[in-house]
């Protein structure tokens, strides 16, 4: 399977540079199995498009100000992106991406406005393992002072105060992500209330978003691509809610590709298993979906693992045709863009 089969032309002007207000004012393209052509709705219409008894599964990870600009002991400039908490939550040990004018050496001490990071291991390809000089609430305060919201590079502006709130879901709880689970950015409290009033339930899993989600695929042969691991957790309450929904015939509606990967990674012996894990699952056409019946997702980059996942779920030809229609109709793409609802039943 070739990466070039997952390409499409996207005018730069369709890459959303800022979110819409309110959050649920974004557009929603709907791909249903019984309909040949996509339907075009607003995201606020979501309650009408789901059924009582369906279960929405959110990713409750919280984006941290993970981008750090500082210097080495020599005075040379250095940039670090905290990618994966190695101890869970806001611990001291992290996997990070780094860049500097000269190589970053093992044992180097990097300083970021008072926050220090010691380089424990140089993994290669720009990845490092580092130990920070604080953890928990002290680390959260230090990141709030020294860190920046890690907006994706296709948002061609510096992050501002609005991004601190808008590049975060309204239910974000567990700190640890270097990117937002962007399908969740469209939800508002009034929309959640309308969904609940219709009998649509919700639960949450946690996957801390890192390079496994946002790094590009190198080379054209998908069989050679290896995902970077990302940590996830499914609570016993979420696992029970998922099992109960299936037992009564409801649909599992994953909000975002990270929720899809969490649920599919945690599938064991006919059910989603509770507990922590680390996933390197690369979902591509031919993947046998077990845990997910529908998904909400944004419009993704050409030639990305996220687009490959959506094609696996909705059908490669059908999804790429829908993307071409989205371009023709002026849908907004990527993190701050519009959304799709894909239904398998």
Curated annotation (Swiss-Prot):
Record's catalysed reaction(s): 7-aminomethyl-7-carbaguanosine(34) in tRNA + S-adenosyl-L-methionine = epoxyqueuosine(34) in tRNA + adenine + L-methionine + 2 H(+)
Any one of the GO BP annotations: tRNA wobble guanine modification
Main location: cytoplasm
One term of GO molecular function: S-adenosylmethionine:tRNA ribosyltransferase-isomerase activity
Subcellular location: Cytoplasm
A GO term from the CC aspect: cytoplasm
Keyword terms, alphabetized: Cytoplasm, Queuosine biosynthesis, S-adenosyl-L-methionine, Transferase
Record-annotated disulphide pairs: none
Pathway membership: tRNA modification; tRNA-queuosine biosynthesis
SUPFAM superfamilies: QueA-like
Record EC number: 2.4.99.17
Uppermost EC category: transferase
Superkingdom of the organism of origin: Bacteria
Subunit record text: Monomer.
Function: Transfers and isomerizes the ribose moiety from AdoMet to the 7-aminomethyl group of 7-deazaguanine (preQ1-tRNA) to give epoxyqueuosine (oQ-tRNA).
PANTHER family according to UniProt: S-ADENOSYLMETHIONINE:TRNA RIBOSYLTRANSFERASE-ISOMERASE
Family stated for the protein in its record: Belongs to the QueA family.
Designated name of the protein: S-adenosylmethionine:tRNA ribosyltransferase-isomerase
Organism: Anaeromyxobacter dehalogenans (strain 2CP-1 / ATCC BAA-258)
Lineage: Bacteria, Pseudomonadati, Myxococcota, Myxococcia, Myxococcales
Gene: queA
